[in-house]
């Protein structure tokens, strides 16, 4: 029994010491030179570094070539841009309990700030961009939404750039075999629907 316990502990230590290829570590160090308490693991085919910087917990994703893909940061409410805090405090959700606040940065996309809220057993996520615009409200949020944070495929990014040259890609999600991409175009939030790489429709609210 002692031998087995010792082996298990040794195995845990080896797992915590995992490091990817040198080119991936170098890309990470170049992007986050002040990172502290770095731990690596693999998720969904990506190399993921969990670390702390300026007292904030981060998780940075890189592909096999060392290209940065995404970073999720766990923020304090006071760290949100002032424009977001002002809009949130004027909203109907201002009295809800703040469970978590995340900043999602992705290659080729604008940063998104997500305020996770709870009140009387109800869960709601508010998605903002840095200028304070609320771009999405998601109720009864599934906690397994990580894949929707990944960047949009390059072919679709190119199509959007050609069709909406001044737009910013905000968010994406897979629903019933179709890809929903939210963009901000001329200050207006629009939803684009794709099947594979084929565009199907674009919709937006008319005030």
What does each model-identified segment do?
Residues 1-6:
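Sec-dependent N-terminal signal peptides
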């Amino acid at each position: 029994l002692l031998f087995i316990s010792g082996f298990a502990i040794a195995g845990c230590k080896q797992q915590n010491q995992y490091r990817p290829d040198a080119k991936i570590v170098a890309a990470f160090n170049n992007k986050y030179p002040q990172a502290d308490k770095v731990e690596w693991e693999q998720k969904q085919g990506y190399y993921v570094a969990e670390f702390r910087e300026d007292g904030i917990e981060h998780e940075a994703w890189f592909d096999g070539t060392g290209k940065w893909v995404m970073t999720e940061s766990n923020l304090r409410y006071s760290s949100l841009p002032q424009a977001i805090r002002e809009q949130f405090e004027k909203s109907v959700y201002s009295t809800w309990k703040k469970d978590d606040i995340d900043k999602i940065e992705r290659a080729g996309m604008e940063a998104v700030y997500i305020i996770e809220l709870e009140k009387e057993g109800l869960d709601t996520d508010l998605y903002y961009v840095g200028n304070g615009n609320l771009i999405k409200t998601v109720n009864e949020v599934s906690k397994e939404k990580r894949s929707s944070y990944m960047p949009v495929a390059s072919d679709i990014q190119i199509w959007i750039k050609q069709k909406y040259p001044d737009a910013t890609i905000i968010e994406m999600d897979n629903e019933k075999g179709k890809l929903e991409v939210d963009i901000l175009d001329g200050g207006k939030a629009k939803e684009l629907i794709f099947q594979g790489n084929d565009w199907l429709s674009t919709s937006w609210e008319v005030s």
